[in-house]
Every structure is written in C-alpha cells, then in structure tokens.
C-alpha cells in the first residue's frame, strides 16, 4: 500500500510494480497528482504530465483509490498489505508570526491561485517572504494574479545564500519581481510591511552566513503578505 498519490507515491508505485509487487495507492483527494495537480502552477508543469504518469502506472497494474484518506497504518496491515509506504508530502505549512497583521500561507495561496485561474483579490502590492523554490513559484504566481501590480520577494539573507535554484531566481527577476534582501519582517500595518534591516555575520551550521539585526527599519508596500518559509511533513 502506498499512502499518497503525489509524485513520490507515483514513483514508489512504479518501481514496486516493475519488480512485480501488487500495489494500491490511496489518495485522499478526488484525483491523484498531489502538489503537481493542486499546488504547483500550470506555468511550471501542467496536469497532462502527471496524467501521463498516472496512466502509465495503471497500465502496469497499479490500483489507485481516490477520495480515500488513511488514518491508520495498522488498518492497512489488517487488510492484508505486507508493507506500507507513506508518501504524504510536506504539506504542513511553515509559519511566520508578525507582531501585527496577518499573513497568507504559500501553499494555500498556490492552491487557490490554481483553482481560480489567478482570479483572486489580494490587492496591488504583494510581498512574498522566503528564499526557497516554493517562494519562487509563489512570487511568479502572484505576478500573474489579477489586479496585482507589484510583487516583492523579501529574504533575510542575500541572493548568494538562497536555497532556491539559481535558474528559479533568474526567472523570478526576469518576470519583474523586485528582490529585497537582508530584510526580516516585523509587522504589517496600513498597507506597509515593516522590516528590520539585517547584516551578514559568521557562517552557521548550514554553511550559510548567519544574520543579525541592525537598528534600521525598511518599509515595503504590502496589501497581502504570503509566507513561504518551509513546509513540513504532517506527522499528526
């Protein structure tokens, strides 16, 4: 049994089926595909790509049960499955608490963006906080959202230390997203995101330069602030 019908679950099912195992995928959504179908914007990868992979593994004999949420591995074992692979994805949002004002989670925004073809009411000025690939997708999607005029990518280190792939960042900049480095968000008030100016310090355990606060405060226009600071696996 494979729990989760996203890219990891589909890949696991493929390799297991190739070795002769009888595989069943359990997917809680209406269709398999995971983040590719429901979160990653169509300008990155279309549904046709994941549909092709799904069709391929089904022809190999993989069974896919949709609209089926699994809450107990023991129940699957009791049904006769010899092994269970959890491929549920990192869908638990990372959080960033501001002293004042509310933020929007990047995964929720991307899901809403895709479901509504970019027709969302998020104002003219959008700030995306984060430096990973999810932040890049979010910034590009925000730039394509109806009514948005300016998108600012706020990161507390410099470009050099961003975890996002270099080509991802280049695409973001080419599409007109404005990059604001060495800023740490503090509060959102009256259409302005107040940020502490940071400075690079000593290298930390991650191999990147650490950062420390300065006394300077920078304001960034913001009707909506979207947080993309790292997703986690929901082990609950």
PLM regions: where:
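Residues that mark the start of a beta-strand
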Residues: 1, 22, 124-125, 150
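N-terminal Rossmann-like FAD-binding beta1-loop-alpha1 element of flavoenzymes
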Residues: 1-25, 134-143
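Conserved Rossmann-like nucleotide-cofactor binding loop
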Residues: 8, 30-31, 91, 134, ...
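Short amphipathic alpha-helical segments
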Residues: 13-15, 37-38, 96-100, 139-141, ...
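Glycine-rich FAD pyrophosphate-binding loop
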Residues: 19-37, 151-160
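Short glycine-enriched, charge-decorated loop/helix-capping segments at active-site entrances
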Residues: 39-44
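A Rossmann-like FAD-binding core segment of flavoenzymes
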Residues: 48-94, 108-122, 144-236
């Amino acid at each position: 049994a494979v729990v989760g019908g996203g890219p990891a679950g589909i890949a696991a099912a493929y390799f297991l089926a190739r070795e002769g195992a009888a595989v069943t995928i359990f997917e809680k959504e209406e269709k398999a595909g995971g983040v590719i179908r429901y979160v990653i914007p169509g300008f990155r990868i279309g549904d046709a790509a994941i549909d092709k992979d799904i069709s391929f593994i089904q022809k190999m004999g993989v069974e896919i049960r949709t609209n089926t949420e699994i809450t107990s591995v023991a129940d699957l074992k009791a049904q006769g499955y010899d092994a269970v692979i959890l491929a549920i994805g990192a869908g638990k949002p990372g959080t960033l608490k501001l002293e004042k004002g509310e933020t929007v989670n990047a995964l929720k925004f991307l899901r809403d963006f895709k479901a509504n073809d970019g027709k969302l009411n998020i104002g003219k000025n959008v700030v995306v906080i984060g430096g990973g690939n999810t932040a890049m997708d979010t910034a590009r999607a925000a730039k394509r959202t109806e009514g948005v005029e300016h998108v600012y990518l706020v990161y507390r280190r410099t470009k050099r230390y961003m975890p996002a792939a270099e080509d991802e960042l280049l695409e973001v900049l080419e599409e007109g997203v404005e990059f604001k480095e060495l800023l740490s968000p503090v509060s959102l008030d009256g259409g302005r995101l107040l940020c502490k100016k940071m400075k690079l310090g000593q290298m930390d355990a991650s191999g990147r330069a650490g950062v420390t606060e300065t006394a300077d405060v920078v304001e960034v226009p913001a009707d909506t602030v979207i947080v993309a600071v790292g997703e986690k696996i929901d082990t609950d």
